[in-house]
UniProtKB/Swiss-Prot annotation:
Keywords: Keratin, Repeat. One of its GO terms (cellular component) is keratin filament. Restricted to hair root, not detected in any other tissues. Interacts with hair keratins. It comes from Homo sapiens. The keyword Repeat applies. This is Keratin-associated protein 10-4. The lineage of its organism: Eukaryota, Metazoa, Chordata, Craniata, Vertebrata. It comes from the Eukaryota. Belongs to the KRTAP type 10 family. In the hair cortex, hair keratin intermediate filaments are embedded in an interfilamentous matrix, consisting of hair keratin-associated proteins (KRTAP), which are essential for the formation of a rigid and resistant hair shaft through their extensive disulfide bond cross-linking with abundant cysteine residues of hair keratins. The matrix proteins include the high-sulfur and high-glycine-tyrosine keratins. PANTHER family: KERATIN ASSOCIATED PROTEIN (PTHR23262), KERATIN-ASSOCIATED PROTEIN 10-1 (PTHR23262:SF50). Residues 36-395 are annotated as: 36 X 5 AA repeats of C-C-X(3). The gene is KRTAP10-4.
Amino acid sequence: MSVCSSDLSYSSRVCLPGSCDSCSDSWQVDDCPESCCEPPCCAPSCCAPAPCLSLVCTPVSRVSSPCCPVTCEPSPCQSGCTSSCTPSCCQQSSCQLACCASSPCQQACCVPVCCKTVCCKPVCCVPVCCGDSSCCQQSSCQSACCTSSPCQQACCVPICCKPVCSGISSSCCQQSSCVSCVSSPCCQAVCEPSPCQSGCISSCTPSCCQQSSCQPACCTSSSCQQACCVPVCCKTVCCKPVCSEDSSSCCQQSSCQPACCTSSPCQQACCVPVCCKPVCCKPVCSVPICSGASSLCCQQSSCQPACCTSSQSQQGCCVPVCCKPVSCVPVCSGASSSCCQQSSCQPACCTTSCCRPSSSVSLLCRPVCRPACCVPVPSCCAPTSSCQPSCCRPASCVSLL
């Protein structure tokens, strides 16, 4: 009976500690029964992986992790390995989401067994506290905040840390959750500068300084959230009226649909008052591209079903094919009025009756359709490039050979 050395092979097997009656508690090499041995790469339930085996065999019961053997300490949450820890032992841990979410100490969550990693150390969860160390408590970080915050360094900081609002008004310094200056006394009912607004205009009176009717979605998507939902008498970014100066009485809120306002290329001037021309309800394709000769034909050409549905000028939305819409180039000529039907941008617009039957006779007796077979009739709308079998009459099979 001999103690294991660096060579642990025994007929391509490695002996386990005494797992049967014939094996003792010590590791055996010479007289170990095959029932006590396994292949060189043991299962985790049998022994530690090969990189963790030391020169003197150690029972697997003393190995608490597949990362490091018992000689590779200290504990998992400490800063590093001991001097005897080899790089092969310092592997990354398989971080679990549950660990990262539920750990009370996220800075040291999900670290490898013997090494330290930053795989689960969000930047925004580092407390940013004031000089008073007594207030430096753990922040109640929310996952969504840490993920979506544009400034993760100051995301979800404790209450004792510096709030987002400036120090002009102490009443504004609420909890620094960056959520709502609207609900706080930032925007007073009086016309004076506040932390959430650079200031009202000079002609602003206290009676007009009411809360704006801005929707929360507007405040969320605004590029300048601090000045989003400000009093009505002040200038806003997301709901700026674009009214004509000569007619201020008609400057009411436009009936623009939210979808229109969302998809508008110029959101700042989207939902403008009724007295002004809305930008969002003027599609690019609605500009008529018609000849000036026919006024009945010169109507709007939207070429989009959505425009035709939502446009306030539906009578001129989908124009006939005598005009040239950008996306619906007509296939009919202007000479034939019967051909000027509603354009559906499909070959079905033109019938095959426009094509003249073939009068050519094939010398080789082949019923082929040559390009000359489908010469369009004057004012016919069939493309010259399409040669369909219905246009051609079968060859009479008269052969000179």
